[in-house]
């Protein structure tokens, strides 16, 4: 059976995942490449109801109030439902799928809740559960958009003001976001993710500049 390819954009909150995912999709459309675009969590869908409760602070006001394994399962079920409903058949028949967040997000945001010594065990469980037991595809390529936490904090506060939206419990917790970034760099190295340094001399690189770096790697993958 001809399996497809799955490209994932990962990074802490405010790192530009949605923007880079969109730019890649626009570029692929221009190049006449067929793809399917997905993003997680799927707010508003029944399968994401528990995720919404968690991020809204209904299970605890702080990320650490909900243990890493419990929180991960909520996100896993949403991904599984999405795979069955939206993109599994397309992927299994050789399709190209572009994802804004994936299993990789639990590796970034949930493993960071655990002491260093327990993170490895958690990652083995997470990947074994989703890619092994649930049968979700393993990504072909993961871009880790690396942005210093002080920059993402500023960008997120600006976004909240501009869009009049409140931060969820992850976004509102600066110490937690710093922990996520530290953890993410370790996970990216362990899992062979493509790290994209999104700043230069403390300033954000232009989004087109970052896109060109991303696109060069995608082209190499697609051949």
Question: What residue spans do the PLM features occupy?
Answer:
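Pre-Walker A (Motif I) flank of P-loop NTPase domains
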Residues: 3-6
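Walker A (P-loop) phosphate-binding loop of P-loop NTPases
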Residues: 14
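Hydrophobic anchor at the beta1->P-loop junction of P-loop NTPases
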Residues: 9
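A glycine- and Lys/Arg-enriched "phosphate-lid" helix/loop adjacent to the NTP-binding pocket
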Residues: 104-182
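NTP-dependent small-molecule kinase module
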Residues: 25, 150-223
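Conserved lysine of the Walker
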Residues: 17
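Hydrophobic positions on the alpha1 helix immediately C-terminal to the Walker A/P-loop
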Residues: 20
């Amino acid at each position: 059976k001809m399996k497809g390819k799955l490209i994932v954009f990962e990074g802490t909150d405010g790192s530009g995942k949605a923007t880079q995912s969109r730019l890649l999709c626009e570029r692929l459309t221009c190049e006449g490449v067929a793809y399917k675009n997905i993003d997680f969590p799927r707010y508003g869908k029944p399968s994401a109801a528990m995720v919404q409760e968690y991020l809204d602070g209904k299970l605890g006001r702080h990320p650490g109030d909900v243990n890493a394994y419990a929180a991960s399962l909520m996100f896993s079920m949403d991904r599984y439902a999405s795979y069955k409903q939206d993109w599994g058949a397309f992927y299994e028949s050789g399709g190209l799928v572009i994802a804004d967040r994936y299993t990789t997000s639990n590796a970034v945001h949930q493993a960071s809740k655990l002491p260093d010594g327990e993170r490895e065990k958690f990652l083995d469980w997470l990947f074994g559960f989703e890619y092994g037991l649930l049968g979700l595809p393993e990504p072909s390529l993961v871009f880790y958009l690396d942005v210093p936490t002080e920059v993402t904090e500023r960008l997120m506060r600006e976004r909240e003001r501009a869009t009049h939206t409140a931060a969820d419990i992850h976004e509102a917790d600066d110490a937690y976001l710093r922990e996520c970034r530290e953890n993410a760099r370790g996970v990216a190295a362990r899992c062979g993710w493509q790290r994209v340094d999104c700043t230069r001399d403390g300033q954000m690189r232009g989004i087109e500049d970052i896109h060109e770096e991303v696109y060069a790697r995608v082209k190499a993958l697609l051949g």
